[in-house]
Amino acid sequence: MRFIIFNGTLKPDAESNTSKVVQMLKLAFEKLGQECKVVTLRDLNYERATKDVKDELAPHIIDIFNCDGVIFATPIWWGGHGSYIQTMFERLDPIYSWSKDNKYQPFYNKVFGTLVSGGGDGFQ
């Protein structure tokens, strides 16, 4: 099986609890013989939009069509998910809307999950 993890951490990897847990999950998948790709959204140059845009994020969105599972990893910020994951959800909106109109369901038969980390600041 092929998995893709979208890492929505806002911090550099060395300081990020989210990145540490993402790497643990990636290693666990690989130990089970599964392919796993990690995309750290913070490292990409992409537009925040609810439309189809050709930028550094676009090829990774296409990868969703060719994998078996997608995981969105985010820290908790002020009781909610991080801004990078929010942008990712917004970028998926045109695909969902297009599929409703065309009876093509690229998200069907895929496993979607979330990985949420918190407490890095000792408060949440």
Region roles according to the model:
Residues M1-N102:
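N-terminal beta1-alpha1-beta2 submodule of the flavodoxin-like/Rossmannoid cofactor-binding fold
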Residues K103-Q124:
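Short, glycine-/small-residue-rich phosphate/pyrophosphate-handling segment
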